[in-house]
Amino acid sequence: MNNMLGYLRNYKRESVLAPLFKMLEATFDLFVPLVMADIVNVGIAAHDLHYILVRCGILLVLAVIGLTCSLTAQYFSAKAAVGYSTSLRHALFAHIQSLSFSEMDTLGTSTLITRMTSDINQVQSGLNLFLRLFLRSPFVVIGAMVMAFTVNARAALIFVVAIPLLSVVVFGVMVITRPLYKTAQVRLDRVLGLTRENLTGVRVVRAFDKEQDEIDRFENANDLLTKMQLHVGHLSALMSPLTYVIINIAIVALLYVGSIEINVGGMASGDVIALVNYMNQILIELVKLANLIVQVSKALACAGRVQAVLDTKPGMDFPAELRSEVPADKAGDAVRFDHVSLTYAGAGAPSLSDISFTAKRGQTIGVIGGTGSGKSSLVNLIPRFYDATEGTVEILGRPAADYPREALRGKVNVVMQKAQLFGGTIRSNLLWGTPQATDAELWAALETAQAAEFVQAKPLGLDEPVEQGGRNLSGGQKQRLTSARAWVGKPDILILDDSASALDYATDAALRKALAALPGSLTVFIVSQRAASLQHADQILVLDDGRLVGLGTHDQLRQSCPVYEEIYESQFKKGDVQK
């Protein structure tokens, strides 16, 4: 938690001035009852209008000064809180970018979004309130008691009894409700999670006619949240009647003692009014202090969750520069797996077991297997999205761990299973990996990806707007644009992770033909469920339950690998010839 305080270092001045100006405001507030007492004791008693007007002028000055101090304190506290949350959000976002896929999988996308948004907002609100009240409220409570003793020591003894009773009620309710607020926050997170899940998967929900089930699930979670919030609200509502009962009893006692003191000449009627005002000030500040503690407790809980993400250490260490030279005997290697195994964090069994193969520069490597066989897991090791649990992955003759992040990702480009585009234009999406690419290079990449025709048909061409997630494009268009984006930078290794699933066979075949015609020694890994897409590959890797059960050409595997033959036969009738 101390690390998070470091983000306040640029706002030290505001963090000091905000509570100081609040204390100044409180100081002027403490003088108001005394001025009121003077008006009653002197001005009204003597029917001195001039005295009353002068004292009213003093009250007005105190109010203006107090308001100025309050607004100034609010400005400084808001500036510090907003600046702090902005710095914290930037740091958290930057830290998330440094995490590997393993940490991202463990934390979860919805959790990280919650930390970035509602948790940091709660920390900001708590800090803003803390800077304004953590000195003011105790100062007013103590100051009001001291001022009461300056008015009349005997009557002020009532404060000595009333303040502990008020404190017991206020802080007792706070202690009881504090853990309930935490439970309510957990249930609120659950409701938000269900909402996010439903909106993300709305097409699947409707495809399976599960709208009513989702409504019922949401209502159950929402009912639990509502019941908890009502329970907390009922307990919190006890604070007002109980505190006002104590205050009213204390005021009655003050009036009783005051009347006796007035009769014996020990105090004036205006002094009683001052004591009642001080009692009300104490009540207000105790309630504020209790609310402050509740809000700060929530903020600290949220800060702890943010800190937990910041404390998550990246599982991968990328060197600043290349660590090794390429041995002469590996100069022609593009990718080499040497007895590689992979077990995901928290998984009970390995996703890949003892995988070994070598892909030469310029080769096309097919990867095929059933659902859950480990195809994506295998290709994700090449750009080092994950580190192998056992064995070594070598890229262009060097261990993948010897490459700086930028160098490795510059040599290996990936077209993901799920096509992801970002809000902007077609041009801005294509320039993601290679900002300096020319229009000619962009159009060449679009031609290769079989996307040039539909981009040319757009009114603005490369400058056609793309909505967030590519919502204004079809699935096939998105896949072709992500493919074009991948080879704009002319990588050494290109991975197509089932990236043609939304394309028809003719477009898929044209894309593979265009890839084969690219100049240079581009090594291509094609992950596909279609045997026809891979039959012309130089090598085909056949995976089954995380193991490499076949390695060879299409014809070789049909003779030697039952798993491949089964996949092939399930897609084509016997005797069909694929060309």
Show the residue positions of the predicted features.
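Short intracellular "coupling" helices and adjacent cytoplasmic loop segments at the cytosolic face
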Residues: A46-H47, V82, H90-T114, S118-I120, ...
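Hydrophobic/aromatic residues in alpha-helical transmembrane segments
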Residues: V32, M36, A73, S77, ...
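ABC-type nucleotide-binding domain
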Residues: P327-K579
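An intracellular "coupling" helix at the cytosolic face of ABC transporter transmembrane type-1 domains
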Residues: N10-R13, S98-S102, S118-L127, L131, ...
